[in-house]
Structures are given as structure tokens and as C-alpha cells.
A protein has these predicted regions:
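Short, structured active-site-proximal loop/turn typified by the sulfatase FGly-forming signature C/S-X-P-X-R
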Residues: 20-73, 132
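His/Asp/Glu-rich, glycine-adjacent segments
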Residues: 62-220, 327-331, 339-345, 378, ...
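Metal-dependent active-site segment of extracytoplasmic phospho-/sulfohydrolases and closely related
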Residues: 8, 30, 232-273, 368, ...
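Active-site-proximal segments of metal-dependent phosphoesterases and phosphodiesterases across multiple
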Residues: 220-234
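Active-site metal-binding loops of divalent metal-dependent hydrolases
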Residues: 13, 260-263, 373
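Extreme N-terminal starter segment of soluble prokaryotic enzymes
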Residues: 2-7
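Active-site neighborhoods of enzymes that stabilize oxyanions during catalysis
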Residues: 116-117, 286-421
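A structural signal for short, well-ordered beta-strand segments and their strand-loop junctions
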Residues: 10, 42-44, 130-136, 206-210, ...
Length: 441
């Protein structure tokens, strides 16, 4: 059993450079304290480097070929319809508001997340440990929770203690509403109130503490323009330290993993990935942020390689992936290479591993597109973050994350290493897919 209880803190979209600057100049005292007492490295996300995909990798210890969450927006072949998790409010509306909200909150965990993937909550609950989560969208566990809204009766199955934007609250904490005033950090403020309540009561063995407001600000202002949001995230982390009686007392009780789910880069212009396939019958294109997918329907006259070749002259697409049987190929600058599962791919961190896994996700498109520098693909409603920040591609800026561990004696190289690291700290054997992870330089 872990000598200390463990908290996984996820600051959505925090880049390594921003984290390093904040702890270097004292603007983030709580993060600085943890960094001074822990081990820090730059780690790598998964691909596409988008929040639902990345949080599923953090929770399961697997890439998308394991957990089956392919993107923020994708085409469900079995049901012949678009699944939209929240590229933008307008995109939710374009895909059907009620169905999209149900997909994002319930069906991602109940239907879309692979039953063969094992979440941290499931594994630790099975081993007799009390689990808790605040606001994270990949939450699948064994405990049934009913919504707080009387008119909504669909349950969620999550960790023992589960708090999700006031919609699911396993305990009455008195926390404020999470959904108003997000520019002022209302969601992180809600997390801080719940986290303080949990720590004060020593109410868990393992907690996921998810802070999304930094990503919201970084999309609006760019990755180097969200210092105020980072200060609020730091205050939310500081609330945990204070609730334990102070920083030293906090570390006496808890081990910590602190990371982000993905990076973020500046975007200068938007593009519609659909434009490259305007004259092609029998395809469905889904895209948002800095990654997109093309689904080939039976009536399409072009094979997947020919679809990928249509993007050779498109300056908005840097690298295009497709499968031929079990083999994965990548096209870049008009040239084609075979992707080795554990090998390098161009200059991308862990490029072969991440590209191979994305292409072997059964819910992924037949063609997967990683955007060119400075480009974002508009979503279903035409929304984008041009002039701000975005993520999703294979590029290092979108893919590298800060990784800080305190009290665990481990330095995860990838976000998929986090779950097995935590499980081993509790003396729980990770699932087989998480034991043989290898990484390319």
C-alpha cells in the first residue's frame, strides 16, 4: 500500500515553459513549493493532443488504441452520427445540443471508453482504496451517482466520491456554482472549495484534481498570455496545502503527480479541413483545434492513400496518417514513410508510438491530419481560436507537458506512464497494456 495518499493534479493546457517560468520567478508559490520538494521533467502527451483523448490516457495508462477515445469530435460508424464532446458551444449546438451534452458527460464513459481499458478509479476501488475525482471528464468507476438536478435521472458511474461541475456531487460541500464567471476562474474556484472540503476530512486515498480554467484563458490569449489564469490555478493548488494545515503537513500526508494533459501553441489562422474534400463523395470530415479526421464511407471511390494524397498540396496539413491493413503510413511534404510503432517519426516527440496508436483506434478516421504550425481547423460551427492558442497536433509545442512528482520516486516520460506509476505506488499491478510501454526519442 502507498505510504502516503496520492493526489493527481491536472492543470489543463499548461505548457512546460509557462510552468518553468512561474516557479522560476515566484509567481506561483504553491507550485514552486511542490517543485522544490519533487522531481520535474518535460513529458509527452498522446495524439491527438486534445483534452478528452489526453484525460482518457491519464486515467487508463493507455494511448487511444487502448481507450478508443479518438478526438473532440468524431464519427460513430456504428450509429452513423457525429459525436461532439465540446469543441465549442456552437459546435455542441450544431451537432445537437441535448445529444452532445449526453455524449460529453455520460456516453464518453458509459459507451465510448473501451471496456478493455482500466481506469485508475476501477483498479484502486477493486483493491479497496477510496477514490475521488473533481471535474475530470474521464471518470469511469464502480459507484453509481445521480445528478443533482431532479429532472435529470441518468446516473453516472464514477469513483466513490465524485464531483462534476455541480451536476454530480456525492457529498454536500457548500461549494459555489462552477459554471459562471469562467474568465475569473470559477471552475478552478469550485474545485478548490471541494478539494479543501475533502482534504480537511481526509476523505480519500486517491484524488484527481482537475483544473481547466488555464486552458480556457490560453485559448483566448495564447500560451504565453495566461499568467492571471495560472495564478488562479496556483491558488487552487494552494487551497489543498492550506487545508492540510500547511505545506509541510500536506507533504506528510500526500504524494503528488502534477502535470497537464497537453501543451499549447499560438495559432495565426484558421482553415476548413473539409475544403480539401469538397469534390469527394462518400467522406465525412471531423475537425477542430489542430487535428482532424476523414472517414471513408463505402460509396467513396478513393482509397485511403488517395484520400491522404489530396492533402499533399494543402499547406494547412503538416502530416497525414492513414492505415493500409495493420501498417500505418505518414505523408509529409509529398513523401510517404511507414510508421514504426516504437520508432521515431520526423521530429515529433514519441512520434511513432503516438501516430501508430492514433491510427489503430477503431473509432478514428481512416485519415488523421496533424495541422501545420500556426494553423487551427475550424469546428463544426466554424469556430476557431485564431489569434490565441490551440493544440491537438503531433508537434512538440502541442505535445510536451510539465511533469512533477513528489514522494513517488518516479519520473513519468509520458502521460500514459502516470496511471501505472500511481497504481504501483499503491501496490496494485497495472493492466497488461500499461506494463510494456516503450518510448522513442
Amino acid at each position: 500500500m502507498a505510504s502516503r495518499k496520492t493526489i493527481l493534479i491536472v492543470i489543463d493546457g499548461l505548457t512546460p515553459s509557462m510552468f518553468e517560468a512561474a516557479i522560476g520567478d515566484g509567481r506561483a508559490p504553491a507550485l514552486t513549493f511542490l517543485a522544490e520538494n519533487g522531481s520535474y521533467t518535460r513529458a509527452v502527451s498522446t495524439f491527438p493532443s486534445l483534452t478528452p483523448v489526453c484525460l482518457s490516457s491519464l486515467a487508463t495508462g493507455g494511448h487511444p488504441d487502448v481507450h478508443h477515445i479518438p478526438h473532440l469530435v468524431w464519427y460513430d460508424r456504428d450509429r452513423a452520427r457525429i459525436v461532439e464532446y465540446g469543441s465549442s458551444f456552437a459546435a455542441l449546438r450544431a451537432a445537437g445540443m441535448a445529444r452532445s451534452i449526453l455524449n460529453a458527460i455520460i456516453n464518453m464513459n458509459r459507451l465510448h471508453l473501451s471496456p478493455d481499458a482500466v481506469t485508475l478509479y476501477e483498479a484502486l476501488d477493486d483493491a479497496g482504496h477510496a477514490t475521488a475525482a473533481i471535474n475530470i471528464t474521464c471518470y469511469r468507476g464502480h459507484t453509481r451517482h445521480l445528478p443533482t438536478l431532479p429532472a435529470v435521472t441518468i446516473p453516472a458511474y464514477g469513483p466513490k466520491r465524485f464531483f462534476f461541475y455541480n451536476l454530480f456531487e456525492s457529498d454536500p460541500t457548500g461549494a459555489p456554482l462552477a459554471v459562471f464567471g469562467r474568465r475569473q476562474g470559477s471552475i478552478d474556484g469550485y474545485a478548490a472549495a471541494v478539494g479543501r472540503w475533502l482534504v480537511t476530512r481526509d476523505g480519500f486515498d486517491f484524488l484527481v484534481y482537475y483544473l481547466p480554467d488555464y486552458d480556457f484563458a490560453s485559448h483566448a490569449h495564447g500560451p504565453e498570455g495566461a499568467y492571471e489564469a495560472l495564478a488562479r490555478s496556483d491558488a487552487a493548488v494552494g487551497a489543498l496545502l492550506d487545508a492540510a494545515g500547511g505545506p509541510d503537513e500536506f507533504l506528510d500526508r500526500y504524494a503528488v503527480v502534477l502535470c497537464s494533459d497537453h501543451g499549447q501553441t499560438n495559432v495565426e489562422r484558421s482553415a476548413r479541413l473539409q475544403s480539401a474534400f469538397a469534390d469527394v463523395r462518400g467522406v465525412i470530415v471531423t475537425a477542430s483545434n489542430r487535428a482532424g479526421m476523414v472517414y471513408r464511407l463505402p460509396e467513396c471511390a478513393l482509397d485511403t492513400r488517395e484520400l491522404a494524397q489530396l492533402l499533399d498540396a494543402d499547406g494547412n496539413a503538416e502530416t497525414v496518417l492513414f492505415r493500409d491493413g495493420d501498417d500505418v503510413f505518414a505523408r509529409r511534404d509529398g513523401e510517404e514513410v511507414r510508421v514504426e510503432r516504437d520508432g521515431p517519426l520526423f521530429d515529433y516527440p514519441h512520434g511513432g508510438t503516438r501516430a501508430w496508436a492514433a491510427a489503430h483506434n477503431p473509432n478514428a478516421g481512416d485519415v488523421i491530419v496533424s495541422a501545420a504550425p500556426g494553423v487551427e481547423f475550424a469546428d463544426l460551427a466554424g469556430r476557431h481560436h485564431a489569434g490565441g492558442g490551440s493544440h491537438g497536433s503531433l508537434q512538440a509545442g502541442d505535445s510536451e507537458v510539465p511533469m512533477l512528482t513528489v514522494g513517488l520516486g518516479a519520473e513519468p516520460e509520458s502521460i500514459v506512464d502516470v496511471a501505472p506509476t500511481i497504481l504501483r505506488a499503491f501496490g496494485v499491478e497495472p493492466p497488461p497494456y500499461a506494463r510494456t510501454l516503450t518510448h522513442a526519442a
